[in-house]
Regions:
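Bacterial Sec-dependent N-terminal signal peptides
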Residues: 1-27
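A "functional boundary" signal
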Residues: 19-163
């Protein structure tokens, strides 16, 4: 009787630990499936999975992974000329970053930068030089505030691409 209770208790604890890890694994699994779909050139499925992975990482407050997946989904929106959805996703990502900054009392320049860069790419694709210039100025401001050499390097390459 005692061994069956102990066995039942151990099994219960094991299932609890597996269940607790499931949401993180689900987000990672979605990201891996999205990468696989992208590799197979199934862009619609990849976009859907990247967006779901973005949402799953956002719920877990894993901001770097969420933004990475959001940027991938946005690039696939732009690839299909879904600019309205792309701009909406950028707004959602910026809102997520703002919420995270408020919770952690620090500014995530390294996460704001790729969102602004993605928005710049959309304005370039839309042939809107005024808004592209505004986004470039915003990128320069973010890079200077971040004091991060890798962001400055990306900014230089982005400037070269623009001109």
């Amino acid at each position: 009787m005692k061994t069956s209770i102990v066995t039942l208790l151990i099994t219960f604890c094991f299932y609890l630990s597996v269940y607790a890890q499931a949401p993180q694994d689900k987000a990672t699994e979605l990201k891996e499936q999205a990468l696989s779909s992208l590799k197979q050139k199934d862009y619609i499925k990849a976009r859907y999975l990247f967006k779901k992975a973005y949402e799953a990482f956002a719920v877990r407050e894993n901001y770097p992974q969420a933004i990475e997946c959001g940027i991938q989904a946005n690039a696939l929106y732009v690839r299909e000329n879904f600019y309205k959805e792309g701009f909406e996703l950028c707004r959602n990502m910026e809102q997520l970053i703002w919420t995270g900054e408020q919770k952690q009392n620090k500014v995530f320049y390294d996460l704001r930068f790729p969102i602004s860069k993605e928005r710049l790419q959309m304005y370039i694709s839309l042939k809107n030089p005024a808004q592209a210039k505004n986004q470039l100025d915003k990128l320069e401001e973010i890079a200077s505030l971040a004091k991060n050499d890798s962001l400055m390097e990306v900014l230089l390459y982005t400037n070269c691409f623009l001109y």
